[in-house]
Structures are given as C-alpha cells and as structure tokens.
C-alpha cells in the first residue's frame, strides 16, 4: 500500500527529529520538518524542531501535579525532550542520556533496566531499549495528536517510515533499533544509514543542480560527528548509461566519540577554572557540570558573537541561592579544548592511540581511548586504501584522481552533525584533510555546502522515501559490512592454547536489501532442544569474500560482534542430532537474517542476536 506521507525519523543520541513529505499535497512533494510538541517547563508544552533525546524519571513528589501532562496523556509520570534535558541535568541520577550509545554496547544487557547508569537504589531505571522506545513513542503520539487528529488514516503507525541508524551500527544494534520502533507502533519501516541520509538531504537541497557540483570520479567523504558517535562514509560518483550515479563504497568502524565526549572535556575545563578559584567539585556536582557544560557549549557554538556562557550548578548548602555555584565559560577555552583536543593536526599516517587493558575497569560506555577525530580519520582512509585499490574505477577520471585514490583521500567532504555548526571545527577538519592532499600532490579537497546540520538526517530520510518511489537518484551500497560465523579449527587440542577460529562468510559486503543466499560448503550439527551459540563477526574492508568463503588468517581485518544463538524446537525429537546448513537474507527493512536449514529442507530455525551481557 502506498501511504500518503513519507516520514523520516532521526533517532539521535542527543536530539531526535522528524521530517515528512506529503505526497497528496501536489505533484512535487518536498520534505519539511515536523515541529514536535514537548514539555519545556512544568505544565507548559511547546513545539520544537528537535526533541532532545533525554528521559527524566522524577522521584516521588519531585514535580507538582500536572507538571508532566501532555495534550494526549494527562497522567504522564516521566518526561522526554527539552524539560527532561534541562531539569534532569540538575538531578542526573534521574536522567537517562545517551540511550542510543548504550543500545549498541555489547558489554551490557541492553534489555535490562540499567539506566540512569549512576541511579541510586531509590531511583527508577529503564533499559536502553525502553528509553529509545519512549523517544519514538513520544514522536508517534505527537504526530497522531496533530497531523492525524481528524484523520485516523494519517496515523504515523500506518505511514511509510524511514528510520536512520549510524552507518557503523552492526546487525545486532540495527535489530534492537527495529525492535524499539516496532514497540512504539512503527511497522512499515525501513532503515537508512545516517551519513547517506545527510547526503540525500544535500541532493534534495540542490535539486537537479547537484550534478554541477560533483563529477565522475569524485570521492565524497561524509563526516558525521553527532552526539554519541563519529561516522565516516565514502560515496563515489560514477557513470551509468550516460548519467551520474552514486555508490556508497565504505563506512568506518563504530567510534563512540562525539558531542558527549566534548561535553565532558568542556566540563573538566570549567571544573579546572573553578578549582583555580578555590571551588572543588565532588562526583555528583561533576555530573551536574557535564550537563550544564553541554548547554553552555551549545550556546557558544550557536552564536558566534558570544564571548562567554554562564554555568550554574547546585552547591552543598541548604539554601538554593547560597548553595549555587556559578562560572563564566570563555569561548576561547571551549574552542581550544575542542579544536586541539578533538581535531588535532596530524600526519596522514597517524594512528589513534589504543587503550592499555587494566586489571580492573569501571563499567560504562566503551568510549574510544583517543579523542582525536582526525587521527581516527587518518586510520579510516589508510585502512580503506588497500580495500578500494582493486575496485573498478570510473572512466575518464582515473588519471586525474590517481594520487588521491592511492591513499583513499576524498575529493570533497560533506559535513553533518551539530558539532560542525562551529566554524573553527569545520575549518580545522578541512585544513587537516588539505594538508594530507598537499603532501600527496593531490588537488585541494573542497567542502560541499550542506543543509541544516541538525535536521539534515531526518529531511534526507524523508527524501529517500520519495526516492524509493522513483522521484530521485538512489545511492547504491547494500550492507556496510561482510558478515561471518566463527568456526573452530578441527586441529587437535593443545593445552593452554584455544583452537584457532576461522571466519565463514555468510553475507558479502554490499549485499542488497531484498536478497538472500545459501552458504555453501559448511555443515553444522545441532541438537534439538539445546541452545547453540555462534560467534558472529564482521568486516568493513573485506570486499571480495563470497558466501561460503572460509578465512583462516583475519587478524586486524575482521572484528567480533555480538554472538548469535538458536534453539532447535521440536519436542518429539528432543536430543536428536540434526545436520543443518546456513542461509542468509537481507530484508527490505535492511535487517540481516541468518537461518539454519535442515539438510532435508523441511525445517528451518532463525538465529537471534544475543544482546544480553557478554562475559
């Protein structure tokens, strides 16, 4: 069924947004932003372009009756959005933030009530999955209370929805995102990678003129630095039947590095300033400082005329006024810590620092050890150089781009994410890239003028929905990784040494949505009624492996992901040994499925991702 509305939802780590195109409003529908009603002060609801991805779980009697009331829910006992972010920052043990980052953390049970992470025994907790569901549910309810108020057929649950995810999200994290969306009532769903959505927004913004901004052979880097993650994507411009075409060639590894890290760095900078003045913060005050620093940072980055921004946190005194701690955060301090700390000048051959493993580590989000985004960029481009070297290159520009291709340098960059609203950060990023281009004797790398950095992903997702209906150019790409099942070697056991693990390819890099394949060559023996676990792996750089390819030596090229589990049901056959082979499918939604099929072809069982805590 073709729906009237095509809807794009950006479920962001820091902010979420919705854009839509009304296909019933004319012959040339355009994506536009839906302003989301939300609580901004106790008892006050207003519309905003963005829904801050924060969940406030108040304690008993912390808010007056009706303070959290919404037009569609008079009895709401929690809040998401602007008020949740602003007030919750003052009581951080009752504020859920970065739920999307926790959703992709394989070291915790993502369906267990673990957030807020530092909540006390008396505080309420929710799971990362539940928090993301609540953000999406709020968006669904807000849409239905406005767009679909008088027309039930316009309810969001029955519209075509494009939901974005980081390009670096693995298959398990994508599955959990789909689960959250379906729990919020969204069934007519397709996933889209956020950097691709940003590129679609650029295409939509330029219309047919985009063909005058790029040429055959161009390699566009989409640099997407959001609240929780840094995503790098390479998109190539090629030619097909005389027309320009686009192909997503590569995505980077999952980097838990973004605005959250920057907020913490700014908070420590402010705390150091207070310490010099004789005020030392305790652990609880540092949590408050982190949220207050985020607001101050966003004020400074949003208004280039501001020279400083105020920070206020609660002290330890009984009096609210007398116990207040205030600090003026200078713009110069913010720009110094962000520019030099997160976008340092470095050589093209630079590698990010790796963390030393310690005997005891505090549980928390697995942030990267090195905050230097430019060093991670160098690693990404150099790692992709060899992977891209053997591909079929577009004709006509091979010689011109040879030097850049030899080191996987892009010819253009498209910025995305609120971080890049700050001119100094964009300029430093581009200057570092151009220093590398100069050293490689390549042409200068240009910046493509993007759309609104906060809303581009949602708008691009809505535009992609129109593309799916034949109204624009589509970026080809398929799966962003090749996927593998781990197979232990059959060699004799050696005391003290684990059996070598081989990687069996079950889904090739770039496997398209709506396709499926048998995995030849390998047979597994499973027992009916017993749970079997498969080690699951992925690679962003191995492009030539086909289903059934068995890789012996894959160190540094393939990474271990969340395992997959399957239980063969069938009570009459309990305990019976069943030989099975694997079959893979990428659904139209963009979800990878791996199935076990009995050799006689009569039965099959789906493997599920084990998203519980990994020991």
Task: List each language-model region with its residue ranges.
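Phosphate/ATP-binding catalytic cores across multiple sugar-kinase/actin-like superfamilies
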Residues: 134-153, 201-213, 341-409, 428-429, ...
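Early-domain small/polar-rich strand-loop-helix modules and first-structured segments
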Residues: 1-112, 190, 197, 241-248, ...
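Short glycine-rich phosphate-binding loop at a beta-alpha junction
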Residues: 150-166, 281-288, 310, 389-418, ...
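Conserved phosphate-binding catalytic cores of ATP/NTP-utilizing and phosphoryl-transfer enzymes
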Residues: 1-4, 191-223, 392-403, 455-474
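Acidic low-complexity intrinsically disordered segments
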Residues: 187, 315-387, 472-615
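Conserved phosphate-binding/catalytic loops in two-lobed NTP-binding clefts
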Residues: 184-197, 366, 429-460
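Phosphate-binding loop and its immediate beta->loop->alpha context
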Residues: 31-182, 193, 264-310, 316-354
């Amino acid at each position: 069924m073709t729906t009237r509305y095509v809807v794009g939802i950006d479920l962001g780590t820091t902010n979420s947004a919705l854009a839509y195109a009304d296909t019933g409003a004319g012959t040339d529908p355009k994506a536009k932003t839906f302003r989301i009603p939300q609580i901004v002060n106790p008892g006050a609801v207003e519309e905003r372009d963005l829904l801050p991805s924060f969940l406030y779980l108040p304690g008993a009697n912390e808010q007056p009756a009706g303070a959290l009331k919404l037009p569609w829910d008079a009895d709401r006992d929690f809040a998401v959005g602007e008020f949740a972010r602003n007030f919750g920052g003052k009581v951080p043990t009752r504020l859920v933030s970065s739920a999307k980052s926790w959703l992709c953390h394989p070291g915790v049970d993502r369906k267990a009530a673990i957030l807020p992470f530092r909540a006390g025994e008396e505080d309420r907790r929710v799971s990362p999955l539940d928090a993301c569901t609540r953000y999406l549910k709020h968006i669904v309810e807000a849409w239905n209370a406005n767009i679909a108020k008088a027309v039930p057929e316009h309810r969001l649950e029955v519209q075509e929805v494009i939901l974005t995810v980081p390009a670096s999200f693995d298959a398990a994290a994508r599955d959990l995102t789909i689960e959250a969306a379906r729990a919020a009532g969204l069934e007519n769903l397709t996933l889209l990678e956020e950097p691709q959505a940003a590129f679609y927004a650029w295409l939509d913004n330029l219309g047919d003129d985009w063909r005058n901004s790029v040429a055959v052979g161009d390699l566009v880097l989409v640099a997407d630095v959001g609240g929780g993650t840094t995503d790098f994507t390479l998109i190539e411009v090629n030619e097909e039947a005389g027309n320009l075409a686009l192909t997503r060639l590569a995505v980077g590894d999952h980097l838990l590095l973004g605005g959250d890290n920057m907020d913490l760095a700014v908070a420590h900078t402010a705390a150091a300033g207070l310490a010099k003045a004789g005020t030392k913060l305790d652990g609880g005050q540092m949590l408050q400082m982190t949220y207050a620093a985020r607001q101050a940072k966003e004020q400074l980055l949003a208004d280039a005329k501001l020279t400083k921004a105020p920070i206020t946190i609660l002290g330890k005194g009984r009096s609210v006024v007398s116990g207040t701690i205030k600090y003026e955060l200078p713009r110069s301090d913010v720009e110094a810590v962000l520019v030099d700390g997160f976008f340092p000048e470095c050589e093209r051959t630079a590698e990010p620092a790796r963390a030393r493993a310690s005997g005891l580590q505090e549980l928390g989000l697995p942030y990267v050890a090195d905050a230097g985004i430019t060093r991670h960029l160098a690693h990404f481009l150099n790692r992709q150089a060899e992977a891209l070297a053997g591909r079929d290159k577009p004709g006509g520009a091979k010689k011109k781009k040879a030097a850049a291709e030899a080191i996987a340098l892009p010819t253009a960059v498209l910025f995305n994410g609120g971080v890049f609203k700050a001119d100094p950060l964009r300029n430093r990023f581009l200057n570092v890239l151009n220093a590398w281009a100069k050293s490689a004797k390549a042409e200068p790398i240009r910046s493509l003028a993007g759309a609104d950095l906060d809303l581009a992903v949602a708008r691009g997702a809505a535009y992609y929905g129109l593309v799916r209906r034949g109204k624009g150019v589509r970026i080809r790409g398929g799966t962003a990784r090749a996927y593998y099942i781990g197979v232990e070697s059959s060699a004799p056991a050696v005391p003290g040494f684990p059996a070598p693990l081989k990687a069996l390819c079950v889904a090739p890099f770039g496997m398209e949505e709506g396709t499926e394949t048998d995995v030849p060559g390998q047979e597994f023996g499973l027992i009916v009624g017993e749970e079997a676990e498969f080690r699951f792996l992925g690679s962003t750089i191995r492009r030539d492996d086909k289903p059934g390819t068995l890789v012996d030596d894959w160190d540094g090229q393939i990474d271990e992901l969340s395992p997959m589990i399957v239980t063969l049901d069938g009570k009459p056959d309990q305990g019976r040994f069943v030989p099975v082979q694997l079959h893979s499918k990428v659904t139209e939604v963009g979800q990878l499925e791996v199935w076990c099929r009995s050799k006689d072809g009569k039965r099959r069982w789906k493997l599920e991702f084990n998203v519980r805590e990994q020991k």
